[in-house]
Design a protein with these regions (language model features):
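Terminal membrane-proximal soluble interaction domains of membrane-associated proteins
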Residues: 131-157, 161
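Conserved beta-hairpin
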Residues: 49-90
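Hydrophobic alpha-helical transmembrane segments
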Residues: 35-46
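N-terminal membrane-targeting/pre-transmembrane regions
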Residues: 1-36, 136-144
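Hydrophobic/basic alpha-helical segments enriched in Actinobacteria
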Residues: 3, 82, 91-94, 150-152, ...
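Non-transmembrane, membrane-adjacent beta-strand/coil modules in membrane-associated proteins
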Residues: 73-141
């Protein structure tokens, strides 16, 4: 069963702002620097495109629940979480994510994904596109994942079936 994952307003605004800033920086450098021998615009362009491309490639695009696993669909390298390894699945109140600190990952450009920590949940791995529909998946090995389908109740129900 497929579950959509759309961006919240904060992620949309941040994605648009980063896109505009990168376009202005890259376009502005090429417009202002007439010296073709300088490599600075090339380095900046490559850096901006790498950041943007990697953020897009690893963003969560949706979720699929099968009989064997939960799949986090991404443009590059899907994430597979075996259902047999799940100890706990719970719909969380959004406030449980409010004090989270990003340890390594992305905090708004195409979503929220990577390693996060907070006092309520401890260390977690997020594959989220919004912060108002969190679902916690905890494995028997103690790994904790935060997913944010548009329909968290249906998602939890599909995993309970």
């Amino acid at each position: 069963m497929k579950f959509a994952a759309s961006l919240d307003k904060t992620a949309i605004v941040l994605t648009v702002l980063v896109t505009v800033v990168f376009a202005v920086v890259v376009g502005g450098q090429y417009a202002l620097i007439a010296d073709a021998g300088r490599a600075t615009p090339v380095y900046t362009t490559v850096g901006c495109l790498a950041i943007y491309g990697l953020a897009f490639a690893f963003r969560p695009a949706g979720y699929v629940v099968t009989a064997e696993e939960v799949v986090v669909s991404r443009p590059l390298w899907n994430v597979h979480i075996r259902r047999a390894d799940l100890r706990r699945v719970a719909k969380l109140p959004a406030r449980d994510l409010s004090a989270s600190i990003r340890l390594f990952g992305v905090g708004g450009l195409f979503g929220y994904y990577g390693r996060y920590a907070n006092t309520t949940l401890g260390r977690t791995t997020w594959y989220a596109t919004r912060r108002d529909t969190p679902v916690l998946l905890e494995t028997t090995s103690g790994k904790k994942y935060i997913l944010t389908p548009n329909d968290p109740g249906g998602f939890v129900g599909a995993l309970a079936a």
